[in-house]
């Protein structure tokens, strides 16, 4: 057997509509991805960027987050896992946009199971009090910020 690959330039919210990509439906062994955190990660000012196409969070959730997770789930084989690196976004002093819970809700609505979270530690950031950050963990009396990796299972 020879390994092959295809490169697609479609956005993750649209790739499931690409006829050339559809041959992979139900054939992926594992999915690991880190989608943009709504409008916090702006990779470019291109009009096709998700934060440009969907400027309101509810639009982004319904037209980017949901189709991206749906494609990841549907293209995964049964009895396999998705690792999804996404974090809630802080708005103001004490409110958050619930990207983590919204992701869990989408996968569970598809029949997937939320299995838990891995905490990917970040390097220490100068000028940031990691103990005051939502996603932080204390190790040897030092606080570290972490990126959540949500783990989902497709039965």
Q: Which residues does each predicted region cover?
A:
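Class I S-adenosyl-L-methionine-dependent methyltransferase catalytic core
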Residues: 1-155
